[in-house]
């Protein structure tokens, strides 16, 4: 009955969405053919120590999934995985099936994703989905830090937020896990919807929507549509959305949807927040009061039900205020005490080249070199302008990747923005910045700038180092 109904629904939409028809039919066939295999594989998973995808760090007793990439074939390492202690190896090429410990499937990646969803559906764990153009990982880590004060929480490791990372996060959930926070990334339309079908989030939050991955999305409108796929899923399943009431773009995605829990600096929100400072970011938060009408409808009213609480973070920059506010909102939604939320915010220390403030000789370095796009680059420059004038300000900016046809325009826009202010020094690194009309020194490659960097004199300066991941500008502070 399930298969017939789904196929009937798919056929009715064929004229308007052939891709959906194909997806539905192939999904049904996959379940029909592989249900018994999946059930058997899941029992093996429960008896294992977990999942491995890399023979360089195989966990003893794990199940090895032989994934493929542009330059590698995991099937070729299946025997090695077993030798190193894997209990089983899941492969999709019969030529490599040399042991009864090797499980042959039609596609290893699809099997990994199906296993993750199967596991997710056997548990009572609540799943939070996080996406956005900027701040996903920082927000995810803040939410984890807050909720972990009173709940058992697992979250995406680092930024493993793609079609492999999301399943791995789900498979790390234990029966005792209360909440799983799943970060979802995308650089093409449809990816967030696909990840939602795997993770099946109960709650969700979009951090921000900016000019990231324009090459894959085609336009800013494409970014909005794709990031909005998280809210589309939540609305279709009547799930709760945590919303930033001060963000007009994400608010527009909600339209008339009422199952939301909001935060913001204005009235008519569940959690009222206020930014008391940005160096570091200090937040004040308090519950907005509600009353219930005779019809049973909850109505937000003015006034507050508890005294304001203030938390001082280890983050800098106004752009991190909403990341912290979102973590506060999740804490309040899940009934954590204000003190627990405060502890969680103040316990989080940024790492991995994300808004890291560090001393480097007589200089202060704001290392924000994990990634960059036009929106986050402009925000970082704006933040530097608000920081103390006691130190001379220097910017070392690297190329912003994946902008496609927008690359020249967006890099020039950043240069034009810089020209509006006085700086002690500006250094532009990368082939895109090298093509701009700029009054500042330009270097075609990181290697070219690395040769010059040791000769530069920085004394009592405030340095902003920011660029896309491929630039790896954090290497500079290991050079001088």
Label each PLM-derived region with a short phrase.
Residues 130, 352-354, 470, 474-475:
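ATP-dependent carboxylate/acyl-activation modules
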């Amino acid at each position: 009955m399930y298969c017939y109904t789904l196929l009937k629904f798919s056929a009715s939409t064929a004229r308007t969405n052939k891709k959906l028809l194909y997806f539905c039919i192939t999904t049904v066939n996959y379940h029909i053919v592989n249900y018994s295999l999946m059930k058997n594989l899941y029992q093996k998973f429960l008896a294992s120590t977990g999942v491995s995808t890399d023979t360089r760090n195989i966990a003893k007793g794990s199940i090895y999934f032989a994934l493929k990439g542009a330059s590698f074939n995991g099937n070729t390492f299946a025997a090695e995985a077993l030798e190193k202690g894997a209990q089983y190896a899941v492969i999709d090429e019969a030529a490599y099936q040399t042991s009864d410990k090797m499980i042959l499937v039609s596609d290893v990646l699809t099997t990994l994703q199906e296993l993750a969803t199967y596991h997710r559906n056997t548990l009572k764990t609540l799943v939070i989905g996080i996406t956005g153009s900027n701040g996903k990982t920082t927000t995810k880590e803040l939410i984890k830090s807050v909720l972990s004060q009173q709940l058992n929480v697992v979250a995406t490791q680092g930024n493993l937020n793609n079609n492999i990372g999301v399943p791995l996060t789900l498979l790390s959930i234990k029966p005792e896990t209360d909440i799983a926070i799943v970060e979802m990334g995308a650089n093409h339309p449809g990816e967030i919807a696909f990840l939602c079908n795997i993770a099946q989030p109960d709650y969700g939050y979009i951090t921000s929507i900016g000019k990231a991955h324009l090459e894959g999305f085609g336009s800013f409108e494409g970014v909005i549509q794709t990031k909005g796929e998280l809210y589309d899923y939540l609305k279709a399943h009547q799930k709760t959305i945590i919303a930033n009431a001060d963000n007009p773009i994400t608010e527009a995605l909600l339209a008339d949807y009422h199952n939301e829990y909001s935060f913001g600096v204005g009235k008519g929100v569940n959690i009222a927040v206020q930014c008391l400072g940005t160096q570091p970011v200090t937040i004040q938060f308090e519950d907005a009061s509600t009353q219930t009408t005779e019809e049973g409808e909850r109505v937000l009213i003015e006034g507050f039900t508890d005294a304001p609480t203030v938390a001082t973070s280890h983050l800098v920059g106004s752009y991190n205020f909403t990341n912290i506010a979102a973590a506060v909102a999740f804490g309040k939604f899940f009934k954590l005490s204000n003190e627990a939320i405060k502890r969680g915010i103040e316990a989080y220390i940024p790492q991995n080249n994300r808004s890291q403030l560090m001393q480097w000789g007589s200089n202060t370095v704001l290392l924000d070199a994990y990634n960059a796009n036009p929106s986050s680059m402009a925000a970082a420059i704006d933040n530097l302008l608000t920081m103390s004038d006691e130190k001379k300000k220097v910017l070392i900016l690297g190329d912003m990747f994946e902008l496609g046809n927008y690359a020249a325009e967006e890099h020039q826009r950043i240069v034009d923005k810089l020209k509006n202010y006085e700086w002690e020094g500006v250094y532009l690194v990368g082939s895109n910045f090298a093509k701009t009309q700029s009054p500042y020194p330009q270097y075609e490659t990181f290697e070219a700038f690395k040769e010059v960097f040791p000769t530069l004199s920085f004394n009592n300066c405030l340095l902003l180092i920011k660029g896309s991941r491929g630039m790896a500008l954090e290497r500079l502070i290991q050079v001088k």
